[in-house]
Structure formats: structure tokens, C-alpha cells
Amino acid sequence: MKGLLPLILLGGLMMLVVGALYYQPVTAQASPSATQPLQAEVEPTVAIAATWAGGGNNSTIDLGSLPADNMERSWPGGSSGEEVHTYSNVYIDLYVRASGDLQNGSNSIPLDNLKYADYDASVSKTAFDTVYALVKKDWGIPSQSGSLTVPVDLYLTVPFATLPGLYTTTIYHAAVQANATAPTTP
């Protein structure tokens, strides 16, 4: 065993030398700042609003009290009439339709008597339909946090002998990304 002692000491000494050569202390340095990349992908967004006389989104279009005189009356689009606004971050195509005839119980005013025009696209006076009609193609992108607005002129003829009462229908504006398939709902 005495003969092995020098070998054991030599082996231990070699292990210390080899360990010292490969020893790399781990040190952490405190820093006054830390940097991390952050990313967020913004999706294509189609967003519109329709307003009447400066009211809120989807405000009721109130044409007031009208005589049953078979005369066409008009309401110019703009801040005191109908407007559509886009907040989209892509080019859009804008469509319009109505739910059907203006109804008051079993009485009605034909939908052909309700018309629209303009949309800042020289849209000629056109009777509403129950299927979507394209009224503005490739409507641009507003500046960030802004909107673009177009006026919508409205026209209504109340036929002779239309019974008194409140007649209603629903106007739908819908938008899709430019050159996409036309909407079918709502």
C-alpha cells in the first residue's frame, strides 16, 4: 500500500491541475437596463360606421313627418344627413341594401320609392334593393387614428293615399376588403 501512496498522490495532483485548467467561474453582472424585442402583427381590419345628422353609429334615420303627396323629397348627405365612415386599415368596397318595403303594420311604401345617391363616387340616384349593391369601390385608407367620410343622399316619395303612421325599414351598409366577394348578410 505504501507503494501506491505516491501514485494516488500523483493522480490526485493531476486531477487538481486538470480541474484548474477547465475551471471557468460563472459570473453574473448587474445591469441598469434589459433589452427585449417585442412584436405584434396587425391584421387587416375592415371597420365602418353609418351616422345620421351627426348622431352615433347606427343612429336612426328620421326623415320627419311627410305628406302623402306623391312628391319626391330629398335629404342631402353630410353632417346634417346620412354619412358613412371608414376606419379600415385596408382598401374596401362599400355596399348598401335595405331590408324591404317601408312597413306600418299591413300598410307599406314600396322600396322603389326610397333611393340613394352620391357616396362621393358620383353614384346616380338609385332605388334601394334587398340585395347588396356596390356603391364605392377601392375606398382608401384613412390616416392613423382617423377616418374617411362619404355623404349619402336619400330620397323618398310617399304615394297618394298612403295611410298615416310610422313607416320603417332598415338600411344596411356593409364593407369587404377591396376586390373580395360581395357580402350577402346581414
Where do the model's predicted regions map?
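N-terminal Sec-pathway targeting helices
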Residues: 1-10
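Signature of Gram-negative chaperone-usher
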Residues: 5-6, 22-186
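Hydrophobic alpha-helical membrane-insertion segments, chiefly the h-region
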Residues: 14-23
